[in-house]
Amino acid sequence: MQALIVIAHHDPDSLTHALAREVAAGLASAGHGSEIADLAHEGFDPRFTLADHAVHRGLAAPTADVLREQARIDRADALVLVYPIYWWSLPALLKGWVDRVFSNGWAFDYQDGVVTKKLRAMKVHLVGVAGADNGIFERHGYGAAMRVQIEHGIFDYCGAEVLSSNLLDDSEGPNAALHLRTARALGEQLFMPAHRQIA
């Protein structure tokens, strides 16, 4: 099995990148493959342009960079997003990737007021890296808001199934080693049947 691991962080020495490497290592140890899409290093342009708007309206085909990203996703058996949480949401680079890549005609069809979900086979795993602790997320409703926005608003809208959503909190505190172990375990268990996964 093959996973596409998408990273949206500008610093290759960040915890976010280290977590993505651990997910990949866990996958490899379980006999699976992975491809890492380092959006910052690859120079992906997250800006939604007039060309993207034309795609959304069904007036043009996606640009070459978007088609490449869609092909990467199509080749994968699972999609893993590893990202820092900025202002209680996805960073702009990753949000722009979603805006441009999950386009009308590929991720969904919208015609005459009817949405057809086209990514029903997609399995998604989310790894959000937060500086704040989980208590702040829950006390202010940020965790619930992110789940609605990302899991329901993006992936469910396209028919994709979010199999795991990990909030690795207090990332600037003493939990880095624990977070790395969590990421490794996620990779090891990514393609394991749910009833066999270790809690």
Model-flagged regions — what are they?
Residues 1-106, 170-199:
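N-terminal beta1-alpha1-beta2 submodule of the flavodoxin-like/Rossmannoid cofactor-binding fold
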Residues 75, 92-96, 102-199:
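FMN-binding flavodoxin-like domain, especially the glycine-rich phosphate-binding loop
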